[in-house]
Amino acid sequence: RAKGLLVGTEAGVEYHQTFRDKGMDRPLPVAFYDPTNPAARDYVWNKLKNNYFDLGVRVFWLDACEPELNPGHPSNLRFYAGKGLNVSNLYPRENARMIWEGMREQGEDEFLTLCRSAWAGQAKYGAAVWSGDIGPTWEALYTQVRAGQSIGIAGIPWWTSDIGGFHGGDASDPAYQELFARWFEFGAFCPLMRVHGHREPREDVASENPGGPNEIWSYGEEVADICSRYILLRETLRPYLTRVMDEASECGIPAMRALFLEFPEDGRCWSWDGEFLLGPDLLVSPITEAGSRTARVYLPRGARWRQLLIAPSRGDEDQEATASYMLGETFEGGSELTIDAPLECIPLFIRENTDLD
């Protein structure tokens, strides 16, 4: 405070927000450091270095880095960089910059920072974004398919969601097990794949109770088997994913792509937003409705597409098999198909002659 490193207000005092953490019997006022101030970034990084980096920590998860001002009145805020109404959206970017500058100063060249918020230009600081504390619902899963495409178009190529949603979800409930399986299948083809959530039975996030179990085996044998197969498939795709991530890093092209980015001449791709491409060649059509066992899929015009099937425990001798997937029938682009989508299968297609190895 005495160094002037905190977010201020037009009245000249620092901004305060009430917050309740574990071990507190009541909410207490907290202030926010001002990441637009280079001296503030240095101050916070030195705290992180002494307490985490020097003990071996190399990956940081930056929660609530908007910051979480409630209520937030940007016009009342004052930053080192200027008036809040003009610069407050820079907060998450400059916060990620704080980590980046500190890590680079320590000689670290390859690292990832996971953030809850982002602003234009943040990706250059090695920052990925997740979509925050979303509900464990089919509606939330539906919106994540669109959110991932939207943030990529906005210039943030590294994105993920909390598989299964964050606030709730009972691992013993068959209805939620279905949702978790479908979300896991979708998550396997997001730029980053991660499970996170505050499952039932749970208490307030400020309590000592971490919530219910949330490992893939917490959801029963069938779901655990499905998740294991998609983890294996994700690992099998590592060479392809590396090429896609390199392109995103070097060119800014998102890993998770709306169809029209690859097929701008196909008018249907501009409105068909329930599918996306992971990189240029892998088409993904997530199931986002409870009980659905078929899917309506559109294959963009200008390419031929071969169905990619998740492998069962033993490969089918009539199909080309790998450890994790099989290649099925080939279809012409411009086709709209209804295909089977049992619980263990997310509709997947690859461009003909694509090398996933």
Where on the chain are the PLM-derived regions?
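Catalytic-domain carbohydrate-binding cleft regions of carbohydrate-active enzymes
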Residues: 1-346, 350-351
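Edge strands and adjacent loops of beta-rich recognition modules
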Residues: 269, 356-357
